[in-house]
A protein has these predicted regions:
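Bacterial Sec-dependent N-terminal signal peptides
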Residues: 1-23
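Pepsin/retropepsin-fold aspartyl endopeptidases
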Residues: 18-388
Length: 388
């Protein structure tokens, strides 16, 4: 009996110690993106997006210049901007020193910053995850870092495969005509979406015409090119033991990049991922999901009919797109109008992510003031969903 107790105690000891993180790092949320602090060669902390879809550690070229980091120009597949391989000595995430063999690249992030409404110093993903398992907690806004195979195994256990550097899990979608379709989906924290269908999968099953009421718009990725995208909804989406009903989705028409992949059906993005505290371990190729305290399956969609972004000098908020048959088009809002105020707040009082959030409040009336043709115009928008 004494020996049995010792064995149980020893087992409990190893279980406990195996789940003690090497370090814990805080993060912030900006819109749908996880922001962590990264230092290069003992620099001041920089704002990096944590993105499981990024196979490279990438630095904004302006920041590389400010830090005095030199690089060598290289050719990247499907790249629409210049890339450099940066010479550096150390890379640290919130003072946690990363492995020495990590390559750091630089490119121009201006187009992303204009779209997201924030300064982006860099992006990191695979170079952290190939060396360490992590547990991301949206309730405490912390990421625990572990050795591979040592992270806690809590929640819905979902195996994944790797498509080059990106994790892929299986799922099933029921389209609005009640057609069920199996698929495989990238798990990407840096994709500001719910569920996106890749263009080959969408074409194969004619998804655009089976998602009910929908509209189209343009999206940007790491390249500077904009791609036509559709927004609609599906009856349900299942993955692991999770089921999400009446889900807004995106449909890509990309001809290059991961959204043109024929081997993967689409992307599970941050609007779904942030519903869960999750463990991801590239060593065991397992993902574990626990619903967090902010879990909310009532997804918000565009209800105004406008998409806003920063001007090229990042000093103004401009109307980038106006959708037909929407509150904005009916109110006479036009492309390139400058947004001056929303609900009495000037653009210096609110960030772009929060502006977009206000414009998704279905049923609310939002008052906006724009500069149109040199004159101020005030409009009241009665917000309604564009896909229901």
């Amino acid at each position: 009996m004494k020996k049995l107790i010792q064995i149980v105690a020893l087992s409990a000891f190893f279980t406990t110690t195996a789940q003690v993180p090497i370090t814990t790092i805080p993060f912030e949320l900006f819109g749908d993106h996880i922001i962590i602090k990264v230092s290069i060669d003992d620099s001041e902390p920089l704002d990096f997006i944590f993105d499981t879809g990024s196979g490279y550690t990438v630095l904004d070229d302006d920041i590389a210049g400010d830090l005095g980091l030199s690089g060598k120009k290289i050719e990247m597949n499907n790249a629409f901007s210049d890339w450099q391989l940066i010479k550096h000595n150390t890379l640290a995430i919130n003072h946690f020193l990363m492995e020495k063999n990590i390559k750091v690249y630089s490119t121009d992030f201006d187009h992303l910053e204009i779209s997201l409404g924030m300064d982006i110093d860099g992006i990191v993903g695979y170079d952290l995850l190939r060396h360490h398992a992590i547990y991301t907690n949206f309730d405490t806004k912390t990421i625990n870092i572990y050795d591979l195979g040592k992270a806690p195994k809590k929640g819905d256990a979902i195996p994944f495969t790797m498509d080059t550097t990106i994790p892929v899990i299986k799922g099933n979608v029921v389209l609005n005509n009640e057609e069920p379709h199996d698929g495989s989906f990238y798990f990407i924290t840096g994709a500001g979406t719910t569920l996106d269908f890749n263009s080959p999968y969408a074409k194969q099953w004619d998804v655009v015409h089976k998602t009910g009421k929908h509209y189209n718009y343009y999206v940007k990725g790491l390249s500077k090119e904009e791609t036509l995208h559709y927004e609609g909804h599906v009856i349900s989406f299942n993955f692991g033991n999770q089921k999400i009903e009446d889900l807004p989705i995106g449909i890509s028409t990309a001809t290059e990049g991961i959204q043109a992949s024929k081997s993967v059906s689409g992307i599970i993005g941050s609007q779904i991922i942030r519903m869960y505290n999750f463990t991801i371990d590239y060593g065991t190729k397992m993902l574990y999901l626990e619903k967090d305290h902010t879990y909310d399956a009532n997804f918000k969609v565009n209800c105004s009919g406008i998409d806003v972004q920063l001007s090229e000098d990042k000093q103004k908020v401009l109307v980038h797109q106006v959708f037909e048959n929407s509150p904005a088009s009916e109110a006479g809002i036009k492309l390139n109008d400058e947004l001056l105020k929303i609900n009495g707040m000037s653009m210096s009082e609110i960030n772009l992510a929060d502006v977009k959030k206000i414009l998704k409040q279905e049923g609310e009336t939002v008052e906006i003031v724009v500069s149109q043709g040199g004159a101020e115009k005030t409009a009241s928008l009665k917000l309604r969903s564009l896909i229901y």
